[in-house]
């Protein structure tokens, strides 16, 4: 590999490391980084005449799915408004190939991610806890709701969703490099702090999905039963402490969920007529059903 190619490769590796941060900064930065990575991947593929990425079942299946999306979108009433988004769907598969390509080219990239991830998570979770305890984050962004925290996302209450999507990746990389005991313990502590912070954000969907994921991992991972029970006990104990000092967490995660799912009346202490969906979501369900009935085979498009 030439010196120029090495510099380009290092630049692309650096851009990959910046991806988690770019989600916090804004969608424009994400699009710029992904576009650069995709173009570089295509450039190197053409230069080296390596078309193996396009000659496999994954790419063929994606092409079939992509054609299906284009076809179904023609029947959409909003094609003129959304056609650009639909046409550029192909960038998802190219982005996946680009990541795989640069992981192969830079043998140390995964290790760089392993070292860089704790720094990102530490800043984000420290900022989240700071906002929880002091009602504003490190940049001075206030809480937009008393029972929710958003950190660097300002008025977008997506901190829990953001972290819950990164935790599986972070945990996977940590287990991959589990031989380094010090970093493994450090990363597990950061992951534990992240799980608690997701609970504190008040995002129930993100929290419950993460709990299901963690329970599955704890069940299938090759640890002693004592260690598994200890992990569950520690997490439950930490949750209990925060609930004790802030009962609104229990109200949001448990009481509101039971009320919405089972139409429970806490004042009368009884269940009313159980509904399978909240009242405010009924128009969405009925509209979706009508759209499906109009085009049962190929749908209405994305």
PLM regions: where:
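Alpha-helical transmembrane segments and their membrane-interface exit regions
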Residues: 39-45, 90-97, 216-221, 240
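Extracytoplasmic loops and strand-loop junctions of Gram-negative outer membrane beta-barrel proteins
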Residues: 80-82, 269-274
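Extracytoplasmic catalytic/substrate-binding loops of multi-pass membrane glycan-assembly enzymes
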Residues: 31, 90-92, 272-285, 296-302
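Transmembrane signal-anchor hairpin modules in multi-pass inner-membrane enzymes, especially those
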Residues: 1-84, 101-111, 115, 173-185, ...
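Alpha-helical transmembrane segments of multi-pass inner-membrane proteins
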Residues: 17-19, 66, 70, 94, ...
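Hydrophobic core segments of alpha-helical transmembrane domains in multi-pass membrane proteins
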Residues: 33-41, 88-91, 209-214, 232-233
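A membrane-periplasm/extracellular boundary helix in multi-pass inner-membrane enzymes
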Residues: 126, 221-271, 286-294, 302
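Non-cytosolic membrane-interface motifs at loop->transmembrane helix junctions
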Residues: 81-88, 146-150
């Amino acid at each position: 590999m030439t010196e120029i190619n090495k510099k380009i490769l290092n630049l692309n590796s650096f851009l990959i490391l910046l991806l988690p941060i770019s989600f916090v900064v804004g969608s424009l930065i994400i699009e710029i980084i992904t576009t650069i990575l995709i173009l570089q991947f295509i450039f190197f593929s053409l230069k080296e005449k390596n078309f193996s990425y396009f000659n496999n079942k994954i790419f063929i299946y994606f092409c079939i799915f992509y054609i299906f999306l284009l076809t179904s979108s023609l029947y959409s009433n909003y094609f003129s408004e959304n056609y650009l988004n639909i046409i550029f769907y192909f960038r998802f598969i190219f982005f996946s190939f680009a990541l795989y390509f640069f992981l192969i080219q830079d043998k140390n990239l995964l290790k760089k991610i392993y070292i860089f991830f704790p720094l990102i998570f530490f800043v984000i979770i420290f900022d989240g806890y700071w906002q929880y305890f002091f009602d504003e984050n490190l940049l001075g962004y206030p809480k937009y709701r008393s029972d929710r925290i958003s950190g660097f996302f300002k008025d977008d209450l997506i901190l829990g969703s953001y972290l819950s999507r990164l935790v599986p990746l972070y945990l996977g990389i940590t287990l991959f490099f589990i031989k380094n005991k010090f970093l493994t313990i450090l990363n597990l502590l950061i992951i534990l702090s992240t799980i608690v912070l997701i609970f504190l954000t008040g995002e129930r969907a993100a929290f419950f999905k993460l709990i299901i994921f963690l329970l599955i991992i704890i069940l299938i991972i090759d640890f002693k039963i004592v260690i598994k029970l200890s992990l569950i006990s520690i997490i439950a104990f930490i949750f209990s402490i925060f609930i004790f000092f802030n009962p609104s967490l229990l109200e949001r995660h448990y009481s509101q969920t039971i009320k919405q799912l089972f139409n429970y009346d806490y004042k009368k202490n009884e269940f009313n007529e159980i509904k399978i969906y909240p009242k405010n979501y009924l128009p969405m369900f009925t509209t979706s059903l009508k759209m499906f009935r109009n085009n049962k085979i190929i749908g209405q498009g994305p």
